[in-house]
């Protein structure tokens, strides 16, 4: 099968030196980019309905840039001033680096794992008399839940945002040789937008 068109279910990279640019030059293929899902923040009213009292938590568990953005967005909307003494437990260096958009980086209050909270076990246990809050979307990775529970700390989840299906109706009559997905939610979006989708000769690539 000769591949001429590819649809990537993610935003277009801002870097012109991405692997996709190399594919386009080398194989003369057309690559389009389109988000199949996107994130929406919950309203202050929706968060209040969860009875979240931010003042009770001196430690925040951050798993992604979205969790960072929506934690500070909703606390501002609810007029809660995040105390300077708040400690942040970041799943990765990328999350910790992004956190600097909102706070001054200090080693004493920002703890960074190597894509795994297990790396921070000793630090979590050090503060096991305090409460921890994890800002999340609709769900949290089961491995993270298992890890945090194993530390025997007092932690709670607060849904501050949600992942929703993007409108792809304008692609109804557009066909691609390959569709590339990066999460089950992307595939779910495909079938919610196009319930009668037939794969036929289209190739499906998953990451």
Annotate the PLM regions.
Residues 1-207:
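Conserved beta-alpha
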